[in-house]
């Protein structure tokens, strides 16, 4: 899922993977960016943040006008959009475009956006990812991130490498810690044991 904010860490991580020259996997059978698919699963149209949908429309992955509530008299269960983009948006709402003269420019990002018509909870979203898209894409590794999660630098690459280097590995998780923000506003609140819990 996506929480509505641009993820510069994701752009940097994707760029690092695409520019990786050491690995046979990333340089075999086509460009590295073609081996990565970002799949966004949103749990229901009504609870979805409209600003997030606007952001996704800006980068090209979402089109409001093509959705139908029903098809041939049957209620729509999910709306699926697929797009490859090289656009991104910063937290300050600035559009970032690729620059051919810059090696740190944005590589293409293949995206699938699954917008469920109704809120049917997290397990149903996981089913869409694994049973729906996973069967078609047949990925080597899936990394799940909840909305609002901000991975550290190189953390996605470290997870991928763990799976790639150990074929017996079935699952892994990263370390989670609270980000207290600037100015200690949240830090002061954590002094209250009820809030901290």
Swiss-Prot record:
InterPro entries per UniProt: Chitin_synth, Chitin_synth_fun
Domain of life assignment: Eukaryota
A Pfam match: Chitin_synth_1
GO cellular component, one term: plasma membrane
Catalysed reactions, as listed in the record: [(1->4)-N-acetyl-beta-D-glucosaminyl](n) + UDP-N-acetyl-alpha-D-glucosamine = [(1->4)-N-acetyl-beta-D-glucosaminyl](n+1) + UDP + H(+)
GO terms, biological process: cell wall organization; chitin biosynthetic process
Enzyme class: transferase
Enzyme Commission number(s): 2.4.1.16
Single GO term (MF): chitin synthase activity
Keyword Membrane: yes
Membrane topology term: Multi-pass membrane protein
Major localisation: membrane
Location in or out of the cell: Cell membrane
Keywords on record: Cell membrane, Cell wall biogenesis/degradation, Glycosyltransferase, Membrane, Transferase, Transmembrane
Function: Polymerizes chitin, a structural polymer of the cell wall and septum, by transferring the sugar moiety of UDP-GlcNAc to the non-reducing end of the growing chitin polymer.
Family per record: Belongs to the chitin synthase family. Class III subfamily.
Name the record gives this protein: Chitin synthase 3
């Amino acid at each position: 899922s996506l929480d509505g904010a641009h993820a510069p860490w994701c752009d940097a991580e994707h760029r690092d993977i695409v520019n990786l020259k050491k690995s046979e996997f990333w340089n075999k059978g086509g460009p590295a960016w073609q081996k990565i698919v970002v799949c966004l699963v949103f749990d229901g149209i009504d609870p979805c943040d409209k600003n997030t949908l606007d952001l996704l429309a800006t980068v090209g992955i979402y089109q409001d006008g093509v959705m139908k509530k029903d098809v041939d008299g049957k209620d729509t269960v999910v709306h699926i959009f697929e797009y490859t983009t090289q656009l991104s948006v910063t937290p300050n709402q600035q559009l970032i475009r690729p620059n051919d003269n810059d090696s740190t420019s944005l590589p293409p990002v293949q995206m699938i956006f699954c917008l469920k018509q109704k809120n049917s909870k997290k397990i149903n979203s996981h089913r869409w990812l694994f049973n729906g898209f996973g069967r078609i894409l047949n990925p080597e590794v899936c990394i799940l991130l909840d909305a609002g999660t901000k991975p550290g630098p190189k953390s996605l690459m470290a997870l991928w490498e763990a799976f790639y280097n150990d074929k017996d590995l079935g699952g892994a998780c990263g370390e989670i810690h609270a980000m207290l923000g600037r100015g200690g506003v949240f830090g002061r609140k954590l002094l209250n044991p009820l809030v901290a819990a």
